[in-house]
Amino acid sequence: MNKKILSDAMTAAKAGLAVALTWVSIAVADNKPEELKQRILNQAQSLGPGDYAFTRTIRSEQTSNGKTEQHVNVERFDPSKSEDGGWTLVSVDGAPPSEDALASYKKESPKRRVPGYYRLAKYFGSASSVSTDSHNQTVFHFNSLPKDSAILMDSDVSSDTSADLSVAEANGTPFVENVRLTVKPMRIKFVMKLDRYESIARYRMGPEGKPILVEHISDMTGSGMGHEGKAHTVMTYSDYRPVR
């Protein structure tokens, strides 16, 4: 009898432990997205606009009222140079930039933002939902972005921009690999009607163990001042050099 009582007690204890472990596992699983989000936030906050010098090549194709123009600009960013915010226009359509092009580029320098992984810190400081894509990657979805996160044609469109951020892993370290932005149809400055804007930014893990931006592709269609148009832009980033 004593053996039976002891056996029953042990069985009950095991069952209770199994239930407890199940609840612990569920709690850990439920907490993983928040832990992952915090890790990526910390990762982005550890980086800054002055971490790297790099080259950016911009290939653009713009069509307005049936006329298409294609251009290729190459520019260089070096945070160790204070002039013009560190930006230098290297070439325009394969040739050295003209004086007018340099003057126009210099005038726009104060508006020119430094792209990079550090900018994602703003995203992860706001509310998001989580899902898993067809590649079994975790995807964070943001219905809108914090103020000053998305600038289009010198206008802040953050509140009308949704974002999907796909998380990959490199040598056991998670990082955001793809960032897809979609802007709702809207009017910009009462002049431009934006019908569609989508972009995707791709990152990879750099040799220093820090994520770096390698490509940004955007597509936009809209109309304004009696003209309809569209634009396709591909920006590639290369020649990264650590500055600090």
Segments predicted by a language model, with ranges:
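Short, flexible helical or helix-coil boundary motifs
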Residues: 13, 17-20, 47
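Structured extracytoplasmic
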Residues: 29-161, 173-176, 182-194, 220-244
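Exposed regions on extracellular, virion, or secretory-pathway luminal proteins
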Residues: 46, 171, 207-210
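Extended lipid/amphipathic-ligand handling interfaces
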Residues: 162-169, 198-207
